[in-house]
């Protein structure tokens, strides 16, 4: 996998996003092995703690699994983020209906929140 780091966004978030996108579009298959923290940090010229933070967040989200010395792999539950997003959207829709907000206004609120 090719990694790109750009100014303007935190590096750990860029790494996290790139892994999620690669899992979603199939560039990273289930059980694909990711580079070691130190190896990826050296490759990108960044601090190992930055890679470790991205990996921790991805593991919390269920996208990857770390198996000690065996390494870090794409989880069989790599689509967990999509499921979490669907659950969040459903909860939001329920709350919006309870408040009597129109669908158009609800979409505008979400778009504004995503831009913030």
Enumerate the predicted regions with their spans.
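Extreme N-terminal segment that seeds HTH/winged-HTH DNA-binding domains in transcriptional regulators
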Residues: 1-33, 83-116
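Beta-hairpin "wing" of winged helix-turn-helix
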Residues: 27-32, 57-69, 75-76
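Short Asp/Glu-rich motifs
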Residues: 41-42, 77-78, 115-116
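Conserved beta-strand edge residues that scaffold enzyme active sites
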Residues: 71-72, 110
């Amino acid at each position: 996998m090719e990694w790109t780091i750009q100014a303007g966004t935190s590096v750990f978030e860029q790494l996290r996003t790139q892994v999620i996108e690669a899992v979603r579009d199939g560039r990273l298959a289930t059980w694909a092995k990711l580079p070691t923290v130190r190896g990826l940090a050296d490759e990108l010229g960044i601090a190992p703690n930055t890679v470790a933070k991205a990996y921790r967040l991805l593991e919390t989200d269920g996208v990857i699994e770390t198996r000690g010395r065996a390494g870090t792999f794409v989880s069989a539950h790599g689509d967990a983020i999509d499921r979490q997003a669907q659950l969040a959207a459903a909860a939001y829709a329920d709350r919006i209906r309870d408040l009597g907000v129109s669908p158009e206004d609800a979409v505008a609120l979400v778009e504004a929140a995503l831009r913030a």
